[in-house]
Amino acid sequence: QQRSSAASDVYKRQISFFAKKNGGIASTIIGAEPETARDATDSFYSKTHVTDYKPMTIADGLRATLGVKNFEIILKNVDEFITATESEIIEAMKIIWSRLKVIVEPSAAVPLAVILSKPEYFKNERVGVILSGGNLDLEDLPW
């Protein structure tokens, strides 16, 4: 299922960009994605739009195919990608729920999962995280 609207694709797909070195001028944009739904990651590093990927992840908002316009936006604006495992996503989701008291879907927990999985990478850095997405079925929680 491919989406055509770039704005819709960015929101719904939630590549979950976050900026390291928050401050505007000296920032790095990192795409965060599930390891088992890494079509944007593979597309970014190969500079080729990967369309034959079959994402399998609890982050159901990230199961759709990367759109053409979104791929173009990624190539122009993202500096790198980091992926998170399913267990890292679940742990991040639990932390957001329990400590921030914010109900988010698994897709929205991916950026935090990446940060928590690479503490040495983000040590002593100012990090901004975008949390969005509360489309969640309480009967289908991953724990």
Question: Model-flagged regions — what are they?
Answer:
Residues 67-124:
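Active-site-adjacent helical/loop segments in soluble small-molecule enzymes
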Residues 1-7, 11:
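Single conserved hydrophobic/aromatic residue that forms the stacking wall/gate
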Residues 12-22, 27:
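Short Gly/Thr/Asp-enriched flexible loops that form oxyanion-binding sites at enzyme active sites
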